[in-house]
Regions:
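N-terminal export leaders
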Residues: 5-10
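Sec/Tat signal peptide C-region and signal peptidase I cleavage site
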Residues: 21-25
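Extracytoplasmic "Venus flytrap"
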Residues: 30-50, 54-57, 63-73, 93, ...
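Periplasmic-binding protein-like
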Residues: 33, 85-92, 112-114, 206-216, ...
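An alpha-beta-alpha
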Residues: 51, 137-180, 184, 271-296
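Flexible loop/hinge segments that line or gate small-molecule binding clefts
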Residues: 104-129, 233-243
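Short beta-strand elements at the ligand-binding edges of bilobed clamshell
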Residues: 119-141, 153-158, 241-254
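Hinge/cleft segment of the Venus flytrap/periplasmic-binding protein
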Residues: 265-329
Length: 329
């Protein structure tokens, strides 16, 4: 795959502000990120957004590489470490051994990697999008909005990070609609909108009237067929105002900001940042209903709001199930 590298710079206003600061305040952490997909892909776009927010605050210098093939990942990691970047962020799901090897070879560099594994001392921290809570809430909406009692779900790969979101969504849907059934498919890619769209079309043709858009392309199919969709990670309702009812949103800022502070304070350590994606840390949330504010029945909206409060109050815990979900249709 092609490799492109971009340098993200502060806006002119931010730069002007930085010039007025004392020298000690202008010391910036050098951060590099490595993405195996285009930066606009929903999952990595949330990491990029959080890092760019730190750029805008004048805290970091940030560069990234996108579309990095798995075979090139180790080389790119080493390149950034050699160039003096003190924090490297990425996704090591398919390159765990190689990524951890690089971390061992550069003990003075801090690594924060999306991973299915555990932290590795002393400098390899891990994270994940623990957004099963808003996924459950979005499932409640889907269960209450389907008229055919059939929901289609299209995912990338059946790995724990995807499976737990699908299971949470399904449990939420069953809470508001015990009769609901699910059609589930994985496309074997993190970024193949045409393939996801075709998988969604197949489910819609079999009666699904609400689609769970774990991947890009699903909402396009729902829009073309006049069906509804539930988004994942980002809110795309602005692009699909009559299609996307709600989305389970991932906010990477709590994770990124915690890691940056640890690096700046010289206290970075190998830890699991996954929990900072949960609602109580503002790492995730259910999107506003927006264009569907008056289309979602009031009693359904109240049930969702009450459940959201129960989660935040610690009175309800969304079960984490990492097993591969199966179709019930």
């Amino acid at each position: 795959m092609s490799l492109s590298r971009r340098l993200t710079l502060c806006a002119a206003a931010a730069a002007a502000t930085a010039l007025s600061l004392p020298a000690w305040a202008q010391t910036k952490t050098k951060v590099a990120a490595i993405y195996t997909v285009p930066v606009e892909q929903q999952w990595v776009s949330r990491i990029d957004k959080a890092l760019k927010a730190a750029v805008a605050r004048g805290e970091i210098e940030y560069v990234f590489s996108e579309n990095v093939a798995n075979a090139d990942y180790e080389r790119v990691m080493r390149g950034y470490a050699e160039k003096g970047h003190t924090l490297i962020v990425g996704e090591s799901f398919a390159v765990e051994a190689a990524a951890r090897k690089v971390a061992k070879d550069y003990p003075k560099v801090s690594f924060v990697m999306g991973s299915s594994g555990k932290p590795q001392e002393p400098n390899f921290a891990v994270f994940d999008n623990y957004i099963q809570e808003p996924a459950y809430l979005s499932g409640m909406i889907a269960g209450g909005m389907t008229k055919s009692n059939k929901i289609g779900m299209v995912g990338g790969y059946p790995i724990p990070e995807v499976n737990r979101l699908m299971h949470a969504f399904m449990e939420g849907a069953k809470e508001t609609n015990p009769k609901v059934k699910f059609s589930i498919s994985f496309i074997g890619s993190w970024f193949d909108p045409p393939k996801a769209k075709e998988a969604a079309f197949a489910m819609i043709d079999k009666g699904a009237d609400v689609m769970y858009a774990e991947r890009f392309g699903v909402s396009d199919a729902a829009k073309e067929k006049g069906k509804l969709a539930i988004g994942n990670v980002i809110n795309t309702q602005d692009k699909y105002p009559d299609t996307v009812v709600a989305s389970a949103l991932w906010n990477m800022e709590p994770t990124v900001d915690r890691a940056l502070k640890a690096v700046k304070d010289g206290k970075f350590k190998a830890e699991d940042y996954g929990p900072y994606s949960m609602m109580k840390y503002k790492g995730s949330e259910l999107s506003p209903l927006g264009t569907f504010e008056k289309k979602v029945p009031a009693d359904l909206a109240k049930k969702v709001k009450d459940k959201e409060k129960a989660i935040l109050d610690g009175k309800f815990t969304v079960k984490v199930n990492d097993a591969e979900p199966k179709s019930t249709l």
